[in-house]
Amino acid sequence: MPAPLYGADDPRRCSGNSVSEVLDKFRKNYDLIMSLPQETKEEKEFRHCIWLAEKEERERIYQTAIRPFRKATYTKFIEIDPRLRDYRSRYGAISNN
């Protein structure tokens, strides 16, 4: 006889409801959702704009937290020593890395 699946006795996964109870609960929630008034296009766009503004604000806060505002310590690339610019590698080939 095979062993039961992992988590089969987990109370969070065992609903303990019969099929009719599950269907009654679904029917009640479905009726509740269908009884809500239909949202107009303007209301939906307004809600979306608010959600988008909140999302952008959260993103700005996150970016500030991981990259605080700093002033650059230098604005130009550091000059490379001319002696290191042309490095002669094996067999006399010039290597610039």
Swiss-Prot record:
Q: Which Pfam families match?
A: Anti-RecBCD_p2 (PF11043)
What's the name of the protein?
Anti-RecBCD protein 2
Q: What does this protein do?
A: Modulates the activity of the host recBCD nuclease. And thus protects linear double-stranded DNA from exonuclease degradation.
| Disulfide bond residue pairs | none
